[in-house]
């Protein structure tokens, strides 16, 4: 009997959604979305991150203005307890993601 890899992937998705760390991020995200200041900072931050990623993918180096803007965003995030908690919880969840990525890609890396 063969294993259906898609069933396993769907089971993994459900397991991730049931992690306490996932639920913690989900809960604080609701709080962030309910706070107009935190929501605006987060949306602007994500938009800026996308701009920087596009520049890097195009081979461009972030300018001094970009670097200053990043520092300004970091200050705003650190000055907002909701966003500080949000990113802290994201980091905790990210540990699982990194571990899963390592496990999933192990057989593929062996083929290189």
From Swiss-Prot:
It holds the Pfam family Com_YlbF. Gene3D superfamilies: YheA/YmcA-like (1.20.1500.10). InterPro entries: Com_YlbF, YheA/YmcA-like_dom_sf. Belongs to the UPF0342 family. This is UPF0342 protein SSU05_1260. It comes from Streptococcus suis (strain 05ZYH33).
């Amino acid at each position: 009997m063969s294993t259906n890899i898609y069933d396993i992937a769907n089971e993994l998705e459900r397991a991730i959604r049931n992690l306490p760390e996932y639920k913690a991020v989900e809960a604080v995200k609701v709080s962030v979305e309910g706070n107009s200041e935190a929501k605006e900072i987060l949306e602007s931050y994500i938009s800026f991150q996308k701009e920087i990623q596009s520049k890097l993918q195009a081979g461009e180096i972030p300018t001094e203005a970009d670097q200053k803007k990043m520092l300004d965003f970091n200050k705003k995030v650190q000055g907002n307890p909701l966003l500080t908690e949000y990113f802290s919880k994201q980091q905790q969840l990210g540990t699982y993601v990194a571990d899963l990525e390592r496990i999933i890609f192990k057989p593929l890396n062996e083929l290189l």
